Amino acid sequence: MTKLTVKALSEDIGTPVDRLLQQFSDAGINKKDGDSVSEGEKQSLLIHLKKEHGSADESASPTRLTLQRKTRSTLSVAGSGGKSKDVQVEVRKKRTYVKASTLEEEKKTEQMKVEAGDKAKRDAEEAAVRELEQKAKREAEEKAKREAEAEVKVKRDAEQTAKRTKTEKAKKEMTTKNDQAKTEADELKLRQETEATRKAEAEAAKLVEDARKLAEENEGRWKEEEQKKTAAEKTADYHVTTSTHAREAEDAADRKDEQQPRRRKKKAKAAPVERGGRNQRGGRNRKPQVNKPTSMQHGFDKSATVAKQDVAIGETIIVSELANKMSVKATEVIKVMMKMGAMATINQVIDQETAALVAEEMGHKVVLRKENELEEAVLSDRDNSATVEGRAPVVTIMGHVDHGKTSTLDYIRRAHVADAEAGGITQHIGAYHVETDNGMITFLDTPGHAAFTAMRARGAQATDIVVLVVAADDGVMPQTIEAIQHAKAAGVPLIVAVNKIDKEGANPDNVKNELAQYDIIPEEWGGENMFVHISAKQGTNIEGLLEAILLQSEVLELTAVKEGMASGVVVESRLDKGRGPVATVLVQSGTLHKGDIVLCGQEYGRVRAMRDENGKDIDSAGPSIPVEILGLSGVPASGDEATVVRDERKAREVANYRQGKFRDVKLARQQKAKLENMFANMEAGEVAECNVVLKADVQGSVEAIADSLRKLSTDEVKVNIVGSGVGGITETDATLAAASNAILLGFNVRADTSARRTIENENLDLRYYSIIYQLIDEVKQAMGGMLAPEFRQEIIGLAQVREVFKSPKIGAVAGCMVTEGTIKRNNPIRVLRDNIVIYEGELESLRRFKDDMPEVKNGYECGIGVKNYNDVRVGDQIEVFEIVEIQRTLD
């Protein structure tokens, strides 16, 4: 029997050898890798490990055992119609065995409970006795206190009697003084009343005089107005029509009415009480009284004008709602919009600017309403302290693909990040912070491929310093130029790291000359940019790069509020299958704590967990620290601002408002009914569409791939992304792809079981990718297959007409000599005269010595009959060609 060594034991239990040797040492057993291990030593190690983890022998053994038994049998039961049927009978038994030591412990527990009850009873009796003694003591103290109070009361009554006598004497003296003061006050009051009466009479006389003057003025004005009214009535035109004959007839009727004597008006009789029957009074055929028609003319003449009012307009508004606010019909609003060059429907959403122009055009005053008042109130309710402290710099590593960005950061972190990425290229932003001898630095590693322009731009917005990595043997490349542009647009200082100086053919001076063309001037040339020569593979001068970064950060004097509610930016986000939405947030100010309520763009939630870039759980994160947070309601967009708020309810309201605002603005931009887009929409039906459903692992990759695919669209083939998102491919995605006839693309994600079943049933095209180059190339190939094929004409034969014969059946027959290629019977032809095409058609007959031939080769004579053409002459050339289909590809 072979001996069991320490190394073999470590492999069996799945533990590193170093850790197993340490455990043996802790147990008091000294071993090496090749030493054998006996059964006793293994038992000793096991007992030591159990003690170390807090599990004793007794606690490890089970105290209760439950056995379950299941028995199945078939019972035949007589049914209707004399037939019997089998019934499955299942009997389940359950039996529990309890360890004897456990029963003894339970008995001890019961006995301890009884003893505890007796003890509590004795304690209660003793407490009652003590309470009686204390009660008697309190009664004695109260009795003594009452006697002392009685003595004090007698003494106080005597003092009050003496004081009362003294007060009555003083009161009599005060009464005499008050009587004298009252007499003087009465005299003063009488004088004041006399003066007030005199003033009132003077004011009344003045009012009477003013009223008389006003009455005289009104009487004169009223007489003048009456005279004007009389003159106006004489010259007024009361005719209701413009017709001359109608006016004359109306004047004659008026004169006739004026000549008739006026009758006295009779008093109106009370209305008769209605009776049952057909009529109120009289017979069955009594006609109802019909009132005389009255004139349709108004009693006054006033032009109707629309009331001008203030119109409050939000960021988006429906056409019908705008019409209601202006108190006009929606058709009037649509007419005004059509005059202004925009075509709209009654239920269409228009933006604030368009609505304001329409309202002003119709003469109303516009009030632009701010709909984000709640959002501003929530974001402004913060308790950040006014004190600021220094913070670590946020550094973004940029450069062309394969120039060594991740390798540089890899050497700094002493980790191999590049190996984890597919193809050795960075697919999404990585955020890390490292501790150096001179302080902490936070790094953002951005991809260098052209498809990740948007991600690189986001990195530049959230950074303080940009480190541009340029390979010394490759020089300035397209993505290097883009990185320079992003850094300049963000106003961020740039440090150039010239990498791969250890390779043959490295030319750092050439890199400086190329970068100088883009205003990146080294300090030794009198510029402002620091150049550091490094080798990420060998680790050459990496410390010099860190010193340059820290020196630049000292010049910038970076500060931030450390205490208070945190705010930051979402660097990356994804949907994790086990943890839900996960967002990488770079804290920019304040301190983010576990349990805080965070508002991220259109999403919100409470931070359930926080992890650093190494996957360790942390409880708080200060400025310039990147963390992964869990607990959001959905996947936020990369670049959204993350802010800690006080109230979760208000955060939900703000998130819902932002979602509705995003939806309304999106609808307002989709003006498909505009007049200028009408013909473009009609022509859009002729363009072939390549529908795509895209799913990726992180939000940044979704945006980058979608942007690259849209750029592949041409005038003939258009890439239409019908659906995109973060996370695995679900059954919903597969159903959407089947309904829209789309292909499914998964980038670093896989389809679940239900989705695979739907894909197989619908025979969908599903493709997985881990490198973006392959995805873009294959989609480009698929789009090339959708292009309309190109047809080319290739000449396969040429015949010279030597003689022309007449045939009663065919007509003109050309006797020809084949000079080039082969003449085939079923191919189209052209007739050329003086190298000019005069006819294009097909052959009717091809003969040689009266025999029909399928083809005639070069150097032979033949007779050719041209279908529907008889004007063949000697010297003409007959050209035979075929149409070849050429498959097109996207450039």
UniProtKB/Swiss-Prot annotation:
Residues 390-559 form the tr-type G domain. The keyword Nucleotide-binding applies. GO terms for molecular function: GTP binding; GTPase activity; guanosine tetraphosphate binding; translation initiation factor activity. NCBIfam families: IF-2, small_GTP. Residues 424-428 are annotated as: G2. Residues 50-303 are annotated as: Disordered. GTP binds at residues 399-406, 445-449, 499-502. It is found in: Cytoplasm. Coiled coil: none annotated. It comes from the Bacteria. Residues 499-502 are annotated as: G4. This is Translation initiation factor IF-2. The lineage of its organism: Bacteria, Pseudomonadati, Pseudomonadota, Gammaproteobacteria, Vibrionales. Residues 102-237, 245-261 have a biased composition (Basic and acidic residues). Belongs to the TRAFAC class translation factor GTPase superfamily. Classic translation factor GTPase family. IF-2 subfamily. Keywords: Cytoplasm, GTP-binding, Initiation factor, Nucleotide-binding, Protein biosynthesis. InterPro entries: DNA-bd_dom_put_sf (IPR009061), EF-G-like_DII (IPR053905), EFTu-like_2 (IPR004161), IF2_assoc_dom_bac (IPR013575), IF2_II (IPR044145), IF2_N (IPR006847), P-loop_NTPase (IPR027417), Small_GTP-bd (IPR005225). Residues 399-406 are annotated as: G1. The gene is infB. One of its GO terms (cellular component) is cytosol. The keyword Membrane does not apply. Residues 445-448 are annotated as: G3. Residues 535-537 are annotated as: G5. One of the essential components for the initiation of protein synthesis. Protects formylmethionyl-tRNA from spontaneous hydrolysis and promotes its binding to the 30S ribosomal subunits. Also involved in the hydrolysis of GTP during the formation of the 70S ribosomal complex.
